[in-house]
Amino acid sequence: SRTPILSVSNRWKDRKDQAEELLRDVEEMLRTLYLAHIGMLDAKHIVSYPEAWQRLTREADDAVFARLLDAVFEARRRRMNQVTWQAVIEGLLLHMTEEVQPWRR
């Protein structure tokens, strides 16, 4: 369902000045998950993440992480191309939701 995505994007649409900070935070989260995935970071560092993201970290292949990080890069590119911030954030959240969906139970 797109309802949670729209709810989050509505909260962020007026925070355009914090866009880069949000994208950095998402990128850092994904980097942390990837480092745990490849064994360079202990799993205790991701226990505060939702269970679906922890499962993705344990079970997904490397390509999932590449696609997620590419989505952050694409969000930055779209932002630079004058796409509305709300549309950028919706696209990123939609992509992240699709990637984590198989690990929800």
Describe these PLM feature segments.
Residues 1-105:
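AAA+ P-loop NTPase domains with strong preference for DNA replication initiators
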